[in-house]
Every structure is written in structure tokens, then in C-alpha cells.
Swiss-Prot record:
Residue span of region P1 (binding site for GEMIN2): 10-41
Protein name: Survival motor neuron protein
Domain notes for this protein: The Tudor domain mediates association with dimethylarginines, which are common in snRNP proteins.
Effect the entry attributes to changing Y267C: Loss of interaction with SYNCRIP
Keywords: Cell projection, Cytoplasm, Isopeptide bond, mRNA processing, mRNA splicing, Neurogenesis, Nucleus, Phosphoprotein, RNA-binding, Ubl conjugation
Record-listed Phosphoserine modification sites: S5, S25, S28
Designated gene of the protein: Smn1
Effect the entry attributes to changing S257I: Loss of interaction with SYNCRIP
GO cellular component: Cajal body; COPI-coated vesicle; cytoplasm; cytoplasmic ribonucleoprotein granule; cytosol; Gemini of Cajal bodies; Golgi apparatus; growth cone
Compositionally biased spans, kind Polar residues: 146-162
InterPro entries linked: Smn1, SMN_C, SMN_G2-BD, SMN_Tudor, Tudor, Tudor_SMN_eumet
Keyword presence, Secreted: no
GO biological process entries: axonogenesis; DNA-templated transcription termination; microtubule depolymerization; positive regulation of RNA splicing; regulation of neuron projection development; spliceosomal snRNP assembly
Amino acid sequence: MAMGSGGAGSEQEDTVLFRRGTGQSDDSDIWDDTALIKAYDKAVASFKHALKNGDICETPDKPKGTARRKPAKKNKSQKKNATTPLKQWKVGDKCSAVWSEDGCIYPATITSIDFKRETCVVVYTGYGNREEQNLSDLLSPTCEVANSTEQNTQENESQVSTDDSEHSSRSLRSKAHSKSKAAPWTSFLPPPPPMPGSGLGPGKPGLKFNGPPPPPPLPPPPFLPCWMPPFPSGPPIIPPPPPISPDCLDDTDALGSMLISWYMSGYHTGYYMGFRQNKKEGKCSHTN
């Protein structure tokens, strides 16, 4: 900071504001900043005094004329629009107006004009809604046609993307369905345990998932050796999940599929733990 006089600067240079390690306290981070505050106040006072006497000229932080360039351009555009003559609207003219509810452009017809307030009342074609609009805000009917064409193009693009995604999802479901038919239940794995309340025992045919199953149960207790079927040396083949029908596209069916996957995950986890325990008990019986 520039100082007003040389004497003040030399006096401040001789003043020691802070020296670490000279305090009596062991904590060197706690120190008195009174001298620093006094030096700052003194420097500010001397600068203000020199500025008041005219020794120092205050220079602005920003150059003049640079901060208002953009508003100047805006004013030019406003002047240009003001110089261009507005269209002389009449009662009964067709126009396009922006509806205040959604901000979209709709075709309308002028029903009344207030030249003093430069406003008018328009009726939207095909809707019958009335709304007051400024005469300067009215658009030609061709603007509405261009806007509707652009909206139709965007809707068509979104529809095409939606159709592509649906086609890809259906193809994936058909592939999963064909794979599930090609890989039926094998003798390496027993069928999943019955659902609560179904009345079907393990190994009985006709196990179906008619509705969303309950949350996945806890892993089953340790399996008995008599319950475990013989296992081959290779790893078991895990059956695929039940195929999802193409007509089941609501959230209820998606929730049911998720709960089924949880149920199957808990079943296979308990099945693996029982297999390990059965194998461990078999080793212990051989050693004994």
C-alpha cells in the first residue's frame, strides 16, 4: 500500500509487529495482534490524509467505458426495434400469441384493441381461451406454423428413440426366453424350496410364481446328509431366472421380478453353505 509520507513508512519499518518464540506462553500460535491492528489503522489514516490533501490521485479499479459495453449494445438493439414500424393490427386479424400458462405459441384472433394502452384481447383458435396481450408481443401466423413444425420434429425424434429402446428390450427378453427354454432344470440342482403357503414340497412339479413373492427368507438351517442329493465333481449349473412376459411392463411386475431374484439369491446362498457343511461333516466322519 502506498503511504502518504516517507516518515510514516520509515517509522512503520522500524516497528516490530510480531516475533515468534518471544512470548512467555508455550503456545506460539496465540499472540496479540494489537500492534498489527494499530499499524493498519495508521496506514489507512495516513493514506486518507494524503488523498484529502491531493498528494495521491485515486485511480479507479476498472477502466472507464468497459463495464457498460453490453448494455450499450442492448440499447442500440432497442433503438433499432423502436425505429422499425410496428404492424398495424386490426380487430379480426389472425396472429400468433404466447400463452402465459405454458409459454408456447398458439394461433389466435384479435377481438378487441386498446390503442391507448397498446394492448389487445386475443382468442386462441380451437381453444376459446381469452387473454390480454401487448400489441408488440403479437407474432405473425407463420411463427406458429414454424413452432409447430419444430415441436412435431422433436416429438417424432423422441418417438423413434422410444421405439428403438422398446425394440431392443423386447429382443433381449426374447433371447433370455429362448435361453431359458434351452437350459431346463438339471439333476445337479434340486428345485427351489416352496413358497410360503404354496403347499408344494421340494422336488414336486408345478411350482409357479403367480404373484410377487415375500422378501427373501433367511438362509436355511444346516442341511441333513439324507436330504442332500449326490453331487458331481464339476460345478453345478445355475438355472436362469423365470422369463418376463413382454406384456408385463408395469412397476408391479418389475417389483415381483426383483423379489424373485432376491429369493433365488438367498436359496442358492443357503444351498452352497449346506453343501460346504455336508462336505466338512463327511471329512470328519472319514477321519473318525
